[in-house]
Design a protein with these regions (language model features):
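Secreted/periplasmic carbohydrate-active enzymes, especially glycoside hydrolases
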Residues: 1-364
Length: 366
């Protein structure tokens, strides 16, 4: 397996843009450092002002009403017998993928992960890749016009109508706490994978506690096979190792395995203020792919015991009732390009220091 990262400098081109005060016309070209949004690139290049200041929000809304192209070239030497899969996350939103002048795929859901087999579209040597973005507001309006009956949605003084007809972060179209910034772009690394028999996209690791107190770690590995075959799956966690042989047929497949871990080898994870937040690394290796993630070993249940006047709602962690204290998490920023891990870490540490132990993830963002 080989991973080729396509992050870095791309070209941003306006396609029939809406009327604006910044001289941006059809074919206007700029640099964009991917992954990021079109809005972030134009703001950082000082082509348009920061929408947070004064009434600049109104001055920059034309960006989300326009269409844009993001493209670059890259060298590749095709390896015999290999397949090539393009891995994409947080594609925002209505867009098409074009490789060497041929349309490969189209996307219309920001909340999905896409793994696109692009083998037949690549050549040895120089390859041209382009993402062509269509205004979500335009698409939403077309969908609204096609409906037999109108579907209402939240409206604000300055907003983008019909937000509920496009699968993207709803707050992009304005909210009571946020500005209207109908973003478009790609917000995670753009990765091309070279692989032979299998492409492994992800895995899950769920700890389950038995009545004796011992643990079972349930593993599911999600992959795509290009032909029938078999291979070895290796799993490690908490000093334990497990190796199993798995067989597969061509197409999407899921490999399932379980690892037994004695209770004495595990330190429990506790909410803030109740104990330590001990995390363990889980690593899997299969067909040249090595994936890892951190997990905490704990049980969580909601108890609805009958009490005077109704029922309780008590969250229990490791059998202990928890008095929940927390906050509602909205997106860190209206500009996706500024959502760094450092800012996430800082905010979460602030919540910890304020003695919070629960966070509700608001559903209208990322």
């Amino acid at each position: 397996m080989r991973r080729i990262c396509l992050d870095g400098n791309w070209s941003l081109i306006a396609l029939s843009p809406e009327k604006n005060n910044y001289g941006i016309k059809d074919g206007s070209s700029f640099e964009i450092n991917m992954p990021t949004s079109v809005q972030d690139a134009l703001i950082e290049a000082m082509v348009v002002p920061d929408p947070y200041y004064a009434e600049n929000e109104l001055e920059t809304m034309f960006i989300g009403k326009s269409d844009w192209s993001i493209s670059r070239s890259f060298d590749l030497e095709i390896a015999s017998g290999c397949r090539y899969v393009l891995h994409l996350e947080k594609v925002d939103t209505i867009s098409s993928l074009i490789l060497n002048g041929r349309q490969v795929a189209s996307f219309d859901n920001e909340h999905r992960i896409y793994n696109v087999d692009v083998t037949e579209y690549l050549v040895s040597g120089l390859n041209d890749i382009e993402f062509r973005f269509t205004s979500s507001e335009k698409i939403a309006s077309r969908r609204a016009e096609a409906l037999e009956h109108a579907v209402p949605c939240s409206r604000y003084k300055y907003d983008s109508p019909n937000r509920n007809l496009v699968r993207k972060a709803q707050c992009n179209a304005a909210w009571d706490w946020g500005l209207c910034l109908q973003t478009m772009g790609i917000y995670e690394s753009i990765e091309l994978y070279e692989c032979k028999d299998l492409y492994v996209s992800s895995f899950s690791a769920i700890p389950v506690r038995s009545a004796t107190g011992d643990w079972k770690l349930d593993i599911k590995v999600y992959a795509t096979a290009f032909a029938d075959g078999g291979t070895t799956l290796a799993i490690s966690c908490a000093g334990k190792e497990l190796t199993v042989h798995v067989k597969y047929g061509a197409g999407d497949c899921v490999f399932v395995a379980s690892m037994e871990i004695p209770a004495e080898d595990i330190k429990l994870w506790w909410p803030n203020g109740f104990g330590e937040q001990v995390l363990y690394d889980v690593e899997i290796a299969i067909a040249g792919f090595v994936l890892s993630r951190k997990i905490g070993f704990r049980t969580i249940e909601v108890r609805n015991n009958t009490t005077m006047g109704g029922k309780k709602l008590t969250v229990c962690v490791n059998g202990k009732p928890v008095f929940c204290k927390g906050a509602n998490w909205i997106p860190l920023d209206a500009r996706p390009g500024r959502m760094s891990m450092e800012r996430y870490d800082s905010m979460i540490c602030d919540m910890r220091d304020a003695n919070m132990n629960m966070v509700r993830i608001w559903g209208g963002g990322w």
